[in-house]
Design a protein with these regions (language model features):
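Polybasic/polar functional segments that serve as interface/processing modules
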Residues: 1-117
């Protein structure tokens, strides 16, 4: 089974991917189109034209796992402008899964402690 704690690299295929593709075809997209390879530390995410569903491909050591998520409300904030494989950090992956943009324009800035006296 998939253990997200073991996943170190979250990759998203920017732009559109045909979600009719299965395990073998998506693995071919990863290796041939993007020149990457599947391993136990990497999870690859794909999104079609309808941004309410995504597929994820993961190699678990003895076989592939294909995950499919369809939102009942809302849409994923998926980057569309580039046809590339982009590496996400765990926080950006979490934002994406929560429906937020992976590139937040604003955030609470870190501050310095102030003297109270």
């Amino acid at each position: 089974m998939i253990d997200l704690a073991k996943v170190r690299n979250f990759y998203i295929a920017c732009g559109y991917t045909d979600l009719r593709l299965g395990i073998d075809s998506l693995a071919a997209v990863v290796t041939q189109q993007y020149g990457s390879h599947l391993d136990e530390e990497s999870l690859f995410l794909f999104c079609g034209r309808r941004t309410d569903r995504i597929k994820a491909l993961y190699w678990c050591g003895d076989g592939y796992i294909l995950l499919y998520k369809r939102l009942s409300n809302g849409r994923f904030q998926w980057p569309r402008s580039e046809a590339e494989l982009r590496l996400l950090d765990p926080q950006s992956f979490r934002w994406l899964m929560e429906g937020l943009r992976i590139e937040q324009k604003t955030a609470i800035r870190k501050g310095k402690p102030k003297d109270l006296f």
